[in-house]
Amino acid sequence: MTAASSSAPTLGIIRLEHAKGLDLPAYETAGSAGMDLRAAVAEDRQIVLLPGRRTLVPTGLILEIPQGYEVQIRPRSGLAFKNGITCLNTPGTIDSDYRGEVKVLLINLGDDDFRIERGMRIAQAVFAPVIQPKIEERAKISETARGAGGFGSTGTA
């Protein structure tokens, strides 16, 4: 785990009752971009995610994100590679003015049932700046060498 610099913005966190005893989001290494989020399911329950199905997993956390920032919810690569478990709506955006519980929308793209247990690391949260540009409607935009080419137009090799 790493310590934030004194000039870093503060991410306020309320831990709800069903998340008591779970670790708060934390950076696992000095170079980590994302903090792991944990499943706040009841101790005596688990969520069984069937192949091809999706579910909303509670984290038991409410975030107070400073204006000018967002928190992005992203998949954990190990869950995706080993089990076919990933986040839908990726990256999910938690806006600075949202004050509800953070939940993670997971889908099982694997072949087997997947059990989500209390405290399991289910996703990553990435704290990121937000820039809101001025919107200006135009009749024309500048030309580029690429033009309107997309979806493989630059090749696949």
UniProtKB/Swiss-Prot annotation:
GO molecular function, one term: dUTP diphosphatase activity
CDD domains per UniProt: trimeric_dUTPase
InterPro entries cross-referenced by the UniProt entry: dUTPase, dUTPase-like, dUTPase-like_sf, dUTPase_trimeric
Protein EC: 3.6.1.23
Pathway noted in the entry: Pyrimidine metabolism; dUMP biosynthesis; dUMP from dCTP (dUTP route): step 2/2
Catalytic reactions of this protein: dUTP + H2O = dUMP + diphosphate + H(+)
Cofactor(s) this protein cannot do without: Mg(2+)
Key words of the record: Hydrolase, Magnesium, Metal-binding, Nucleotide metabolism
Ranges in a coiled coil: none
Residues that, per the record, bind substrate: R76, S77, G78, N89, T93, I94, D95, K103
GO biological process: dUMP biosynthetic process; dUTP catabolic process
PANTHER family xref list: DEOXYURIDINE 5'-TRIPHOSPHATE NUCLEOTIDOHYDROLASE (PTHR11241:SF0)
Protein family according to the UniProt entry: Belongs to the dUTPase family.
Reported function: This enzyme is involved in nucleotide metabolism: it produces dUMP, the immediate precursor of thymidine nucleotides and it decreases the intracellular concentration of dUTP so that uracil cannot be incorporated into DNA.
Protein name per the record: Deoxyuridine 5'-triphosphate nucleotidohydrolase
Gene: dut
